[in-house]
Amino acid sequence: MVEVRDIAPGLWLWRQPHPDWEPGGDWDPMVSSFAAGTALFDPLAPPPAEREVWDRLAQTPPELAVVLKPDHVRDIDLFVRWYGVRAFGPVLFWPGDVPKTRLEFAQPGDELPGGLQVLHDGRGKAETPVYVPEHRALVFADALTAPHGELLVWATPWHEERVLPALRELLALPFEHVLVSHGEPVHTRADFEAALEREPWGDTDSNA
């Protein structure tokens, strides 16, 4: 079952079970992929029968895709092969989950096509969130999560020293939407501000 949800004009998501999820993990089996205009973020291909996603992509063919974190490779190779997208992301990946596509390196401070801004989250997990100015949206892989609906920062040993200062810097951007891969995917600026004041989620030794 794939859920398709509109967030704002031209900004939408599809949400589905991750095929590699195993019981007992520290992340929700339902994961989200995001589309902003012709840009995709962490795309996971839905089954062929889920026509709504594929029809939307046919109507507005993607031109670029971003892998936001080394363990979010998902189906980037398929989208490169089928749509000819320019693919951006890390240069280092987990063994056994290395894309065949040679991604263009995206690092904090870069500006990608369409004015997308690559950001720093302070967690030291090689994640590069992206700000989409046209849609006033921040898109995260794992830096924030919402396993029970409430937006939380994913824990690290240096939450206070590094992560919170980096995330607070993002408040200088005029974003309205905060999008996260795991748990409830769509949040507001107020939710983001509140998350910075809450206790972080999960174990500090997590790979997320």
Where are these predicted regions, by residue range?
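Zn-dependent metallo-beta-lactamase
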Residues: 1-37, 208
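A contiguous pocket-lining binding segment that forms or flanks enzyme active sites
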Residues: 98-132
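Active-site HxH/HxHxD metal-binding segment of metal-dependent hydrolases
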Residues: 45, 49-112
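Flexible, charged surface loops at secondary-structure boundaries
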Residues: 6-7, 28, 34-37, 57-61, ...
